[in-house]
Regions:
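Bilayer-spanning, highly hydrophobic alpha-helical transmembrane segments
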Residues: 12-16, 231-263, 278-296, 577-606
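Actuator/coupling domain of P-type ATPases
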Residues: 29, 36-124, 128, 140-147, ...
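Juxtamembrane helix-loop transition segments at the membrane interface in multi-pass membrane proteins
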Residues: 52-61, 105-116, 294-313, 622-628
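Membrane-embedded transport module
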Residues: 247, 509-513, 550, 555-628
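Conserved catalytic phosphorylation-site environment of P-type ATPases
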Residues: 63-71, 173, 274, 284-360, ...
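Short, hydrophobic transmembrane alpha-helix segments
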Residues: 20-33
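Conserved ATP-binding TGD loop and adjacent catalytic N/P-domain core of P-type ATPases
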Residues: 402, 428, 434-578
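P-type ATPase nucleotide-binding
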Residues: 340-466, 475, 484-503
Length: 628
């Protein structure tokens, strides 16, 4: 509990004890009134203060005003009737504050899930100077600086390990409890905790651009984006509260006047004013105003604990209505780790063909280029390469040792007018031409992720109507992967722009109430991520583009996290609708009973505080998503 919560709990206990003791004291009249005023003010002075400030600021109609009017009115009736029954007024304020304390604790609990993620923020970075370590502010570390991370410390800035081996705890970012190995040459992201060895890391980004900064910025902004349900409840409360206040006023005034002037009967002012005050307590919209945002907040907190970062409750709500999921193949359903599985050459020797291909691809960071460089396995002398030109969706041309080399797909060969040989093997075929003559081709294969097939099956179980895969790979390769994984629809041999067109087409074809989610690995996917109803970036650790463009960011590359994200969103929305129906139904029944004089102030307390506590308890279930 926070200091503020402990103080409130002390006030509640003190007021409750006094209320019980006062009922055993044989006092009447003004003394009884003064004595009961003590627990009333102990527990409710801040509510009265807020209500008065609201009146002064012309923001009258809120829950503080309702509670203040209802309790002061109840005291006035008891005082006027000389009944001495001030219990109801004190009890209303007491139970209302119990509900507020409960709500504060619930929000704090859900916020702690996000706060745990906030703990990834590093306090310092170690730099070696004159043989000793100096702690500096991460903001002061420039790109290219070698920092030292000791066991137990957080990695402050993204970089590459230049010396040392260790294991890293990435659970705060990914939700994955298994430590990750790190060695020289490995890329490493900020926010991880170094567990074992000392690591020397050469920074590749400034602190403000590092993964930890991007993630924290995303999480901090997530609570500001409200869902349609939250906006509806906010607007509802804006008009609902004044309406019930005027309704209560009408209930207090009109029936007595009708009795007096139309029926010639006694007006029974006290009875109708009491009904109106009961009506006010029942009508307090706390259960809705508190539990709906809390459901989304807890849902976002629970998701973040699992390495699923949702940029706002509006995206969580939209995700629950997803019926179409479109995948980019490479790095999403497959590992994106390509391997050369065959080199078919003409007159040039295999080693030389692979060398020329590796040199031509040496400036590219594409996974296929990296696989060719790995297959060559030797250090590349880039001074031998010049006039490099990358043709999007086709391949690369360059001069190697003065010779014209073209490395790419069938489209590149057709573009250059070079006859090529087809290959019977399933995989990505990289054709090569040297000095305008066909030199052979390299067969590269991507490996499917072990959980991709299970993820597709579970998505369908979760209510996804259609799964679609988009890829730039050859039709033969794409069809094989789609068949293996159980994908419903596949579109192959696409350029980056073609993927946007395909998503546009799917958006036009789908039903209006069904959302379309696009899942990519964040590399060259920004336009499509932004165009889909929901953009999901998977394996986004270290990818600025993914974090910027996506609506939902999965911090590791497990396709099953997509299923979990959708299940979390559905659970969250289900709880939101449960709370709305439950709160409105109970309040509706109690309001009718209150207006008819059947319900008293004690039932009103249940209709207000009881419903609020039950709704909050239900909302807190969105925190528990581990087993989804």
């Amino acid at each position: 509990m926070t200091k503020k919560q402990k103080k409130m709990l002390t006030r509640i206990i003190a007021a409750a004890v006094l209320l019980i003791l006062l009922n055993f004291l044989p006092v009447t009249g003004i003394i009884r009134f003064v004595l009961f005023l003590i627990p009333y003010l102990i527990v409710g002075y801040d509510i009265l203060k807020k209500a008065w400030k609201g009146i002064l600021n012309r923001q009258v109609f809120d829950e503080n005003f309702l509670m203040a009017v209802a309790t002061v009115g109840a005291i006035a009736i008891a005082f006027y009737e000389k009944s001495g029954d001030f219990n109801e007024a004190v009890a209303v304020m007491l139970f209302y504050q119990i509900g507020e304390l409960f709500q504060s604790y619930a929000v704090g609990k859900s916020r702690r899930n996000i706060s745990e993620l906030m703990d990834i923020r590093p306090d310092y970075a170690n730099i070696e100077q004159d043989g000793s370590l100096e702690q500096v502010d991460p903001d002061e570390v420039e790109i290219g600086t070698v920092i030292i991370v000791q066991p137990g410390e957080k990695v402050p800035i993204d970089g590459v390990v230049v010396e040392g081996t260790s294991t890293l705890n990435t659970s705060a970012l990914t939700g994955e409890s298994v430590p990750r190995e790190a060695k020289a040459g490995d890329e490493i992201i900020s926010g991880c905790i170094n567990l074992t060895g000392v690591l020397k890391i050469r920074t590749t980004k400034e602190f403000g651009e590092s993964t930890v900064s991007k993630v924290l910025e995303l999480v901090e902004e997530s609570t500001s984006r409200k869902s349609r349900s939250e906006n509806f409840i906010s607007k509802f409360a804006k008009y609902y509260t004044p309406a019930v206040c005027y309704g209560a006023l009408a209930l207090a005034v009109l029936p007595p006047l009708v009795r007096m002037f139309a029926m010639g009967a006694a007006p029974q002012w006290n009875d109708w004013i009491y009904r109106a005050l009961t009506f006010l307590v029942i009508s307090c919209p706390c259960a809705l105003v508190i539990s709906i945002p809390l459901s989304f907040f807890a849902g976002i907190g629970g998701a973040s604990h699992e390495g699923i970062l949702v940029k706002g409750s509006n995206y969580l709500e939209a995700l629950s209505k997803t019926k179409y999921v479109v995948f980019d193949k490479t790095g999403t359903l497959t590992q994106g780790i390509f391997e050369v599985v065959g080199v078919h050459h003409n007159q040039m020797e295999e080693k030389q063909l692979l060398e020329y291909a590796a040199l031509t691809e040496s400036a590219s960071s594409h996974p296929i280029s990296k696989s060719i460089q790995r297959a060559y396995g030797k250090e590349l002398d880039r001074s031998r390469v010049s006039e490099i030109e990358e043709i999007s969706g086709n391949g690369i041309t360059a001069k190697v040792d003065g010779r014209s080399v073209a490395v790419g797909n069938v489209k590149l060969m057709n573009r250059l007018g070079i006859p090529y040989k087809s290959c019977h093997k399933v995989g990505t075929i990289i054709h090569m031409a040297i000095d305008g003559e066909y030199a052979g081709h390299i067969v590269i294969s991507d490996v499917e992720k072990p959980t991709s097939k299970e993820a597709i099956a579970k998505l369908k179980q979760a209510g996804i109507q259609k799964t679609i895969m988009l890829t730039g790979d050859a039709k033969q390769v794409a069809d094989q992967v789609a068949a293996d994984l159980g994908i419903d629809e596949v579109h192959s041999e696409l350029l980056p722009g073609d993927k946007v067109e395909q998503v546009e087409r799917l958006l036009a074809e789908k039903p209006a109430k069904a959302n379309l989610a696009f899942v990519g690995d964040g590399i060259n996917d920004a336009p499509v991520l932004g165009r889909a109803d929901i953009g999901i970036a998977m394996g986004a650790m270290g990818s600025d583009a993914a974090i910027e463009a996506a609506d939902v960011v999965l911090m590791d590359d497990d396709p099953l996290k997509i299923v979990k994200a959708i299940r979390i969103s559905k659970k969250c929305l289900g709880i939101v609708y449960q709370n709305i129906v439950f709160a409105l139904a109970v309040k509706g029944v109690c309001l009718i009973l209150g207006a008819l004089g059947i319900a008293n102030m004690w039932l009103a307390i249940f209709a207000d505080v009881g419903v609020m506590v039950l709704a909050i308890l239900n909302a807190m279930r969105t925190l528990f998503v581990k087993k989804l």
